[in-house]
Amino acid sequence: MDFYNHAANILSDLSKKKGSIKQLAFNSKKHDPKRTYALVCETLKYKPVLDEIIARSELLVLEKKLKENLARVLVHDLLMSKRGLSISNGPIKECILRHKTRLNAEFVKLKVKKGVKSHEELALKNPVSLPRWLRINTIKSTKDEVLQGLGLDKVSSIEELGPDKFYIDDCVENLIAIDPSFPIVENSLYKEGKVIIQDKASCFPAAVLAGLTGHVGDIIDGCAAPGNKTTHLAACFPKSHIFAFERDAKRVQTLRKMVGISGANNVTIEHQDFTLTDPKSDLYRNVTHILLDPSCSGSGIVSRQDYLLGNEQDVTEDTERLENLCSFQSTILKHALQFPNCRHVTYSTCSVHRLENEQVVCEVLSQEPDWKCNSLTKTLPNWKTRGIPEYCAQPSMAEGMIRCKPGAGGTIGFFVANLYHPQREQETFKMYKNDDDTKKRKRKKKKKEVKKKARIQGEE
């Protein structure tokens, strides 16, 4: 009985916005979290149906001590679970079984009324269906090997995806989409780290940096755990050394595991707060690129279960929490811009809020006038949705920003700003151009000397 009370309490906590389904289900070690999670999701999936059956049977009128959410989970398992009610004999079981005939009758009537044969047809449908994105880990594999290993048929759009189909993304290199029903976690490609499950939008920061021209030295990932973006950087820049910062001990372990699975041997994990590093340290003198994805509200994250919560889970962000997040985001971005040889920085969040996105970038750039937003042509031009000009200090800044709307284009809600230091970029260009010119002159001179030597030897 404790199990059903626990599930009912989670339903109550969800209505009070005390957490997500997953958080609440997996917080308790007393009950099987997977079983709890499944029952809560299934109950929510059929909530309108269960409520109608309970109302028409007058269950709560006749059993005044029975609470609404407990009635929902019990009636769900009585009518819809293959194993039925998993409950020992007692008052609650007797209470439900007393009304079994009436509940079953109302269930049958409802199916007839709706014109369906099975209860599955009565379930709530998810209006936002995201594909599962797989990043091909080029450290360990190739596109050809992965596609052959999946054994799926190619389609030309994510809308055409099905259990036996895949789609090659046209915006991010080495990224493919598959249907969520495909059992990828059981596939050897996933187990061996040859493919990494990573949302398309989450691939944008590293993809933006990879699309830039010019010299690339060392790279910093300032908020690295769980490691998807870090390992993406490692794959995009195999000749660069990557410093991956994470201050939380548990998340460091997650990061180490992810880096290990990916096979990235050009990553150094730094268990420390990135904002406490000394930008002028010799250790970071070769850093030219920085990727920042700091803590945020997560308001853009689309869970596959969000639709089950309906309007009950519409999030009105706590103003104080948002302000604290924005303060931290501004601090870490300002810190990143202090590295003396850094030329490119991407700042990203999985938030849809102006405060955490355009406002943070504009505020920091107003204090760091040597830094600018990059151009559209250097910021994944294939992705059409940019920053919001009205939110920017100068409308043109929006071109160097990327926005993703939750669910649109198969992504979560996301934001990326592509920042650069024009003077340092130009100086680096000149320096490496001069080096190239010097090398060319030396090669030319050497060729002349070789020819001259050969001619002299021929004359002798």
From Swiss-Prot:
Protein's GO biological process: rRNA base methylation
Protein keywords: Methyltransferase, Nucleus, RNA-binding, S-adenosyl-L-methionine, Transferase
CDD domains: AdoMet_MTases (cd02440)
Active-site residues (renumbered): C350 (nucleophile)
Family: Belongs to the class I-like SAM-binding methyltransferase superfamily. RsmB/NOP family.
Subcellular locations according to the entry: Nucleus, Nucleolus
InterPro entries (alphabetical): MeTrfase_RsmB-F_NOP2_cat, MeTrfase_RsmB-F_NOP2_dom, NSUN5_7_fdxn-like, NSUN5_RCM1_N, RCMT, SAM-dependent_MTases_sf
Matching Gene3D superfamilies: Sun protein, domain 3, Vaccinia Virus protein VP39
EC number, as in UniProt: 2.1.1.-
Name under which the protein is recorded: 25S rRNA (cytosine-C(5))-methyltransferase rcm1
Reaction catalysed by this enzyme: a cytidine in 25S rRNA + S-adenosyl-L-methionine = a 5-methylcytidine in 25S rRNA + S-adenosyl-L-homocysteine + H(+)
Major localization class: nucleus
Pfam families noted in UniProt: Methyltr_RsmB-F, NSUN5_fdxn-like, NSUN5_N
Residue stretches of biased makeup (Basic and acidic residues): 430-439
Region (Disordered): 430-460
Organism per entry: Schizosaccharomyces pombe (strain 972 / ATCC 24843)
Entry function: S-adenosyl-L-methionine-dependent methyltransferase that specifically methylates the C(5) position of a cytosine in 25S rRNA.
GO cellular component: nucleolus; nucleus
PROSITE patterns attached to this UniProt entry: SAM_MT_RSMB_NOP (PS51686)
Regions of compositional bias (Basic residues) in chain numbering: 440-460
Subunit structure: Interacts with trm112.
Molecular function as annotated in GO: RNA binding; rRNA (cytosine-C5-)-methyltransferase activity
Positions of S-adenosyl-L-methionine binding: C223, A224, A225, P226, G227, N228, K229, E246, D273, D293
